[in-house]
């Protein structure tokens, strides 16, 4: 299994900031699905208008190379390739007049797209 960080008890600054809002929303969605084995997987893939794009999915499997972060009893998974692009990023959940969505604020992104899910390094 991969590296696990329990954000509530970790004294050092974690490599990712999984916000309370995001953790609460993930917990709510898992409860709606009635499947406590689900974890939120965040990944980076090639594509989008700026070269890379973020993706979110639910997964039951923790891969050997996954970075695992736990907050409020829910787990966030990031594969090793995606992790290098997400170090220092904040994973949040926001609601606005345009809708509600998970968002990533990434200080490593040289530029981002108006869609909010695409970036370049």
Swiss-Prot record:
Protein residues bound to iron-sulfur cluster: 49, 113, 115
Pfam families to which the protein is assigned, alphabetical: Fe-S_biosyn
Gene3D superfamilies linked to this entry: HesB-like domain
Manner of cofactor binding, per the entry note: Binds 1 iron-sulfur cluster per subunit.
Any GO BP: iron-sulfur cluster assembly
Keywords in alphabetical order: Iron, Iron-sulfur, Metal-binding
Family matches, as SUPFAM superfamilies: HesB-like domain (SSF89360)
Presence of keyword Iron-sulfur: yes
GO molecular function: 2 iron, 2 sulfur cluster binding; 4 iron, 4 sulfur cluster binding; iron ion binding
Coiled-coil stretches: none
Cofactor: iron-sulfur cluster
Family: Belongs to the HesB/IscA family.
Protein task: Required for insertion of 4Fe-4S clusters.
Assembly and interaction partners: Homodimer.
Protein name (Swiss-Prot/TrEMBL): Putative iron-sulfur cluster insertion protein ErpA
Source organism of this protein record: Nitrosomonas europaea (strain ATCC 19718 / CIP 103999 / KCTC 2705 / NBRC 14298)
Lineage of source species: Bacteria, Pseudomonadati, Pseudomonadota, Betaproteobacteria, Nitrosomonadales
